[in-house]
Amino acid sequence: MRAYPIKTRYIKRGENFIPIVVEAIKNSGIKLEDGDFVVLSEKMVSTAEGNFIDESKFKPGVLAYLCYYWSKYLWGYVLGKLLKVKEDKIKNLRRMPKEETLKHKQTIIEIVGLRYALKPYAEGGVDLTNVPGTYACPLPKNPKKWAEELYKEIKKELGVDVVVMVADTDATYRVLNFYFTALPYAIDGIISGIGVFGFILGRLADVLKIGGFAGCTPLAIAGNEVYKKYSIGELTRIAFICDRVHKTIKNINEVLEKYNTYVITEEILEKLEHTPVVVVKIKEEYKPESQR
């Protein structure tokens, strides 16, 4: 299996990405073949839907304070260690800024619910990276529709029968023979909608050696039905590999420092490199740069 990130320009809020993605694939020099996977970032799809929420408009209530202290102190100093959360995540929880976190937690409570806000980080698929200003970006409202539309356009323009997947970077966990995610929804075969309980189950499975991290989470899939022969574990692994090759903002503070600003703007986002699409060739063997 080998993954190829596809560069596009920054997709703006409400902009139809389908012709942009098709053109980017044409210009990439990669020859698509029947059965290849074209994997889309959920952020690009949600941005195209205009699905932004301004967190500055939310006034924190009692539950937001509860979620803040629960995340920063109980997870940062107790549960994080017990459930073997990565050390960098624990450090970030302990440094969690109060004002911004309270607004973010209140947003999560009102948009997707308390059971997602209780997750210490990456709550409910609501993302703060690669979005301008004080906006947050929830999961796409209809990822299946976009996957189907892109599939049809690729088949029409390029004459190939591919699989189109929309995937989120948030984890899917395996517990024995079952798959869980803390996200509000996922493809069939992954138990979703359980919020923080999915996260706790996944961490416990890792500690007890009965499962653990399986990969990233496919939200929708369409096109060539060859995908039906793949297990949930294989599909989450494909999504994970795509996440590894995406070029995206990993550290907002580094970007703010580089551009000497306190807020990310669309103008800054347009200057950054974006690879919200990844082509995965299942049958092609990965080779290190030195062997190519």
Swiss-Prot record:
Compartments it resides in: Membrane
GO molecular function: coenzyme F420-0:L-glutamate ligase activity
Topology of the protein relative to the lipid bilayer: Single-pass membrane protein
InterPro entries: F420-0_gamma-glut_ligase-dom (IPR002847), UCP006563 (IPR012030)
Spans through the membrane: 175-197
Record's keyword terms, sorted: Membrane, Transmembrane, Transmembrane helix
Coiled coil: none
GO cellular component term of the entry, any: membrane
Pfam family, one: F420_ligase
Entry-linked PANTHER family: COENZYME F420:L-GLUTAMATE LIGASE, PTHR47917
Protein name: Uncharacterized protein MJ1361
Organism: Methanocaldococcus jannaschii (strain ATCC 43067 / DSM 2661 / JAL-1 / JCM 10045 / NBRC 100440)
